[in-house]
């Protein structure tokens, strides 16, 4: 099984390790709920070095990425980041990812752990007619520093000059400090940073964060945090069989430049014209019980919806989920252990900056 540069640190902290896309990763360090709450109230740190930073460089880097991605990176300024989907020719989602613009000829993309090899292969397959170099940065590590006290913690472990620059970063902006890249991005619904740095330096950085008030958090808390924030998980909430239209991600497909072609555009426009018969929603269980991926939602007209992600919400103290359901249907219920339990359909975002949105 693959190991991140922080593997020994996780073992020393008595983390429970699990197989995640072939990587041995910490699911928790004791109490998943405590780790979750710590990120909502204080500062938690995550080892996400199983994800991969890929640099796209060359005179046609922007031209290539405008073709590769459904969002339009031509609108990105230097030191800004953008969320978007990478589609196949049928408009199915190959991956969702964040693109960082370093210069007009240098971009960095961070891809999901389970798609590392397939994404890089897809990049290379589609780059053959462009003057670009694609470089997976396998010698880098990634640490997410998340929570309302993330700024305070990170300021304690860097110089005053760097601290001021990090604190000044706006959401979805980033800056390089030598070989370190610090971005004000995250996957929790809280303020925070994602730090991409040389793997040889990550243990010292991790230890410094812990010594200055941060607490480690595992993939279990990362999943409940992103679920509360209404953020998609690739492979659960969407995959190549789904388009952005069915998953509430149409906003991330930029059609404003009608002259721009991108992979999947023709199929996407056809699907958009045809319309989709489902909508993307949040689900809240009104009674005790647990919502899980794969559960059916039944409606009184006989139609069904399906939960793609579900869990107990430590912040809201109820079960929540993300689901696709018929556009017109009433009185939703889920069947849990032979009982029909009422659920409420809400906007697919439950918590922002520690506050309930439902």
From Swiss-Prot:
<dbReference type="InterPro" id="IPR027266">
    <property type="entry name" value="TrmE/GcvT_dom1"/>
</dbReference>
<dbReference type="GO" id="GO:0004047">
    <property type="term" value="F:aminomethyltransferase activity"/>
</dbReference>
<dbReference type="GO" id="GO:0019464">
    <property type="term" value="P:glycine decarboxylation via glycine cleavage system"/>
</dbReference>
<dbReference type="InterPro" id="IPR006223">
    <property type="entry name" value="GCS_T"/>
</dbReference>
<comment type="similarity">
    <text>Belongs to the GcvT family.</text>
</comment>
<dbReference type="InterPro" id="IPR029043">
    <property type="entry name" value="GcvT/YgfZ_C"/>
</dbReference>
<comment type="subunit">
    <text>The glycine cleavage system is composed of four proteins: P, T, L and H.</text>
</comment>
<dbReference type="InterPro" id="IPR028896">
    <property type="entry name" value="GcvT/YgfZ/DmdA"/>
</dbReference>
<keyword id="KW-0808">Transferase</keyword>
<dbReference type="GO" id="GO:0008483">
    <property type="term" value="F:transaminase activity"/>
</dbReference>
<dbReference type="GO" id="GO:0005829">
    <property type="term" value="C:cytosol"/>
</dbReference>
<dbReference type="InterPro" id="IPR006222">
    <property type="entry name" value="GCV_T_N"/>
</dbReference>
<dbReference type="Pfam" id="PF01571">
    <property type="entry name" value="GCV_T"/>
</dbReference>
<keyword id="KW-0032">Aminotransferase</keyword>
<dbReference type="InterPro" id="IPR022903">
    <property type="entry name" value="GCS_T_bac"/>
</dbReference>
<comment type="function">
    <text>The glycine cleavage system catalyzes the degradation of glycine.</text>
</comment>
<protein>
    <recommendedName>
        <fullName>Aminomethyltransferase</fullName>
        <ecNumber>2.1.2.10</ecNumber>
    </recommendedName>
</protein>
<dbReference type="Pfam" id="PF08669">
    <property type="entry name" value="GCV_T_C"/>
</dbReference>
<dbReference type="GO" id="GO:0005960">
    <property type="term" value="C:glycine cleavage complex"/>
</dbReference>
<dbReference type="InterPro" id="IPR013977">
    <property type="entry name" value="GCST_C"/>
</dbReference>
């Amino acid at each position: 099984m693959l190991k991140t540069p922080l593997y020994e640190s996780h073992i020393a902290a008595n983390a429970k390790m699990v197989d995640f896309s072939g990587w041995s990763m910490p699911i928790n360090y004791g109490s998943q709920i405590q780790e979750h709450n710590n990120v909502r109230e204080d500062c938690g740190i995550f080892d996400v070095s199983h994800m991969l930073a890929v640099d796209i460089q060359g005179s046609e880097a922007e031209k290539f990425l405008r073709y590769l991605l459904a969002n339009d990176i031509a609108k990105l300024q230097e030191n800004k980041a953008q969320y978007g989907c990478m589609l196949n020719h049928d408009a199915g989602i190959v991956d969702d990812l964040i693109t960082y613009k370093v210069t007009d000829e240098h971009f960095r993309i961070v891809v999901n752990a389970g798609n590392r090899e397939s994404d890089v292969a897809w990049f290379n397959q589609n780059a053959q007619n462009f003057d670009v170099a694609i470089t997976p940065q396998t010698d880098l590590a990634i640490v997410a520093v998340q929570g309302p006290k993330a700024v305070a913690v990170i300021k304690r472990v860097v110089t005053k000059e760097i601290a001021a620059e990090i604190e000044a970063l706006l959401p979805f902006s980033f800056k390089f400090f030598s070989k370190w890249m610090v971005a004000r991005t995250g996957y929790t619904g809280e303020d925070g940073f994602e730090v991409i740095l040389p793997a040889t330096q990550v243990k010292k950085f991790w230890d410094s964060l812990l010594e200055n008030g941060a607490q480690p958090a595992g993939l279990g808390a990362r999943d409940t945090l992103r679920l509360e924030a209404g953020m998609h998980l690739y492979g659960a909430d969407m995959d190549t069989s789904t388009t952005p239209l069915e998953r509430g991600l149409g906003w991330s497909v930029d059609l404003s430049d009608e002259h721009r072609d991108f992979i999947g555009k023709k199929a996407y426009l056809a699907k958009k014209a045809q319309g989709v018969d489902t909508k993307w929603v949040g689900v809240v269980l009104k009674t005790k019980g647990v919502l899980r991926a794969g559960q059916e939602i039944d409606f009184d007209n006989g139609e069904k919806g399906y939960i793609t992600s579900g869990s107990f919400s430590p912040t809201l103290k109820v079960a929540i989920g993300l689901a696709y359901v018929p556009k017109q249907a009433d009185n939703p219920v889920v069947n849990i252990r032979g009982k029909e339990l009422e659920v409420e359909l809400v906007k697919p975002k439950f918590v922002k900056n520690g506050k309930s949105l439902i």
